């Protein structure tokens, strides 16, 4: 299927590894030009039809600078993918999570997307429309314990923003949707200081045992495995495509059947 993305201009945040890098590769494979932002851009060097920009997307100015780069380079922004985010496991639960830690979670998972969206929407309105895909999380509506209380609250705010903006800007040609992954085989879960290792240290077990224990405690996957970054990217690119031109304000879960409720 032709996703009709050839020649389109896409901006991707947190694009240098994991889900973000997979999204960049998937967009390029569909013929899009990608302006890709991250703190470190070594992994993006030399990629065809990719303009990397080293930028702090957690800063007040960073997201708008990335969008401005796309406008400078290509004169338009057809697609924005807000992939910026981060989680730090809060072993002390709600009472052990400070205002500063909540502020960090909101900065990483909500305000970065808000700022990039504001800049992109301003441009999209001048050109007659565009598509925005926010990478949220199942933690926006699924909290097995207090360990991700700040992260979940920030992602819930992002999902709410998506719904609100879809109503405001849908009549003006801008579509906005969410993709909410469950656990994905990236460094966030499996890397150094990732969720599995952090839980394992607290429990006195290794990271593999901790990963199995955490997943079992929340009901396990129907598919029996983590989602891959490439699978998330496929869903993101589909929602960015003009082929899904009447899809907006929706939240698509990709979690291997982790969530059991309707």
How would you describe each model-predicted region?
Residues 122, 167-168, 245:
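Alpha-helical segment proximal to the catalytic Tyr-Lys
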Residues 91, 225, 236-237, 248-262:
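Short C-terminal tail/terminal secondary-structure segment
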Residues 90-94, 98-103, 132, 217:
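Substrate-binding pocket helix/loop in short-chain dehydrogenase/reductase
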Residues 170, 175, 247-249:
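Short, small/polar-rich loop/turn modules that mediate ligand/substrate recognition or access, typified
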Residues 9, 16-17:
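Conserved glycine-rich cofactor-binding loop
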């Amino acid at each position: 299927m032709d996703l009709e993305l050839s020649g389109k201009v896409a901006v991707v945040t947190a694009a240098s590894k994991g889900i973000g890098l997979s999204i960049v590769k998937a967009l390029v494979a569909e013929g899009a030009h990608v302006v890709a932002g991250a703190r470190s851009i070594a992994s993006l060097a030399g990629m065809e039809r990719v303009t990397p920009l080293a930028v702090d997307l957690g800063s007040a100015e960073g997201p708008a600078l990335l969008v401005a780069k796309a406008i400078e380079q290509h004169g338009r922004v057809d697609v924005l993918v807000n992939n910026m985010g981060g989680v730090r496991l809060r072993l002390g639960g709600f009472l052990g999570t400070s205002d500063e830690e909540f502020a960090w979670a909101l900065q990483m998972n909500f305000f970065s997307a808000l700022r990039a969206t504001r800049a992109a929407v301003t441009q999209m309105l001048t050109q007659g429309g565009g598509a925005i895909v926010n990478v949220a999380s199942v933690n926006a509506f699924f909290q097995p314990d207090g360990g991700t209380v700040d992260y979940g609250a920030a992602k819930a705010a992002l999902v709410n923003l998506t719904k609100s903006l879809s109503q405001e800007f849908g009549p003006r040609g801008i579509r906005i949707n969410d993709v909410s992954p469950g656990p994905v085989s990236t460094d966030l879960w499996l890397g150094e200081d990732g969720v599995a290792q952090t839980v394992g240290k607290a429990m006195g077990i290794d990271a593999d045992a901790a990963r199995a224990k955490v997943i079992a405690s929340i009901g396990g996957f129907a598919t029996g495995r983590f989602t891959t970054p490439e699978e998330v990217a496929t869903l993101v690119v589909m929602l960015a495509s003009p082929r899904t031109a009447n899809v907006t304000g929706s939240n698509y879960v990709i979690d291997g059947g982790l969530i059991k409720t309707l």
